[in-house]
Regions:
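Domain-level signal for Mg2+-assisted phosphodiester chemistry and nucleotide/NA-binding surfaces
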Residues: 1-85, 95-98, 125
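Nuclease catalytic cores that cleave nucleic-acid phosphodiester bonds
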Residues: 59-171
Length: 171
């Protein structure tokens, strides 16, 4: 794996949300753990420019706060997927391959190995970012660069408890 990065590179970041969430929950042993996108994305980009950021998420229940935050901070979006994110993410990566220099895939799923090989054959630099324990070795080896997600890249989310309002009793 080479680690040469050109400063003028344009980057697309494609996140398999369900895969990353399951990996982080498994590693942290907590369902309340969330990926800290605000620290991870700048770390992944370095001095490169972000062209696209898309968070693929299975299901219809998608946090509007996440979608809003991605849009405000990175002009990113959340794409709901019917089942797994594998196919929609692969299609989008293939579509973007002519528009970017580098594609960073946040997933350790070995299902992406053929996508990685295809993108590399098209001249795209492919980087994988995932939790080490849940990353397929073949995916890590095939990528041009591997970024491990560590406990520094997530946080425990505890929603603020709503205060119960008491009605004032009238005498």
């Amino acid at each position: 794996m080479t680690n040469t990065v050109l400063i003028s590179q344009t980057v697309a970041i494609l996140i398999d949300g369900n895969n990353i969430e399951r990996s982080i929950h498994s590693e942290s042993k907590s369902e309340k753990t969330m990926l800290n996108i605000d620290t991870l994305i700048p770390k992944l980009l370095g001095n490169r420019s972000l062209n696209r950021l898309i968070y693929f998420r299975e299901g219809l229940k998608i946090s509007s706060k996440l979608a809003e935050r991605l849009h405000q901070n990175y002009h990113g979006s959340v794409r709901p997927c019917h089942k797994s994110a594998d196919i929609p993410l692969s299609i989008k990566a293939t579509q973007l391959s002519a528009k970017v220099d580098t594609i960073i895939i946040l997933s350790g799923d070995s299902d992406y190995i053929e996508l990685v090989r295809h993108l590399k054959s098209e001249g795209v630099r492919v980087e994988i970012c995932a939790v080490k324990k849940t990353t397929a070795a073949i995916l890590e080896e095939e990528a041009d660069h591997y970024h491990p997600i560590t406990n520094e890249d997530w946080f425990d989310y505890s929603p603020a408890k709503k205060k119960r309002s008491r009605k004032k009793s009238e005498n």
